[in-house]
Amino acid sequence: MNPQELKSILSAGLLSFPVTDFNAQGDFNRAGYIKRLEWLAPYGASALFAAGGTGEFFSLAASEYSEIIKTAVDTCASSVPILAGVGGSTRQAIEYAQEAERLGAKGLLLLPHYLTEASQDGVAAHVEAVCKSVNIGVVVYNRNVCRLTAPLLERLAERCPNLIGYKDGLGDIELMVSIRRRLGDRFSYLGGLPTAEVYAAAYKALGVPVYSSAVFNFIPKTAMDFYHAIAREDHATVGKIIDDFFLPYLDIRNRKAGYAVSIVKAGAKIAGYDAGPVRAPLTDLTGEEYEMLAALIDKQGAQ
């Protein structure tokens, strides 16, 4: 799959990021991960991102990363394209990117670099180096320390033909509008704020109809129903699902930093696809929070 073909795929439909399965000892659970991917693939996501933020990329050892990407690529070879999360320092990100390409990933999501303070010119140089290290398509993720501006993205687009996507995790509407207007159809645009469904209607109005769903990990039918309601501008259905599920869900998620990942793993366990504990420094939901989430999921019915 060439970068332009990937761009076309990412320009429509729902995307998701499977959690990474760990056993009770905290080691990668390959069998559980395969089972998860086989469950999720038929629901109709346009692409799945292995070892992304929700997949706890930041906590993985290099050897685990290779096994996770290979498992995802092999399991989903005939069903859904797999993109791989990459990040860290520039040299680390290049190593991950080249390994993911070697293992057959169709593209990459370039996560924000390590927490070193840097100018955005330096961040752009980091992105350029990673893009030029591979031939597959790359989506850059503007979030936290990565705040690339429209002029910098335009420069990167000229220098890196395989940079085909922009994912927004900042929620800076002025910046998003400037990027969307200036770059036009050069990129595919993905909404990437935590619990992106809450912002989906607003982002669609900005020309960003595609987003990544974390809750697809445990209520995939509801996630797809919500996406289709957004696509057809069924405001009544969108409002009902936000009121009945997403707002109470946010009340739980917002209790602690890092719960955006922890709550998804809890949801997967409730759905019958236990992915094990999160890795430190993240913490799992408390027993009370888990039961609150279970009651909320139960109201969504069979998936």
From Swiss-Prot:
Pfam families (UniProt xref): DHDPS
Record-linked Gene3D superfamilies: Aldolase class I
Functional pathway: Carbohydrate acid metabolism; D-glucarate degradation; 2,5-dioxopentanoate from D-glucarate: step 2/2
Cross-referenced SMART domains: DHDPS
Gene Ontology MF terms: 4-hydroxy-tetrahydrodipicolinate synthase activity; 5-dehydro-4-deoxyglucarate dehydratase activity
Entry keyword set: Lyase
GO biological process: D-glucarate catabolic process
Protein name per Swiss-Prot or TrEMBL: Probable 5-dehydro-4-deoxyglucarate dehydratase
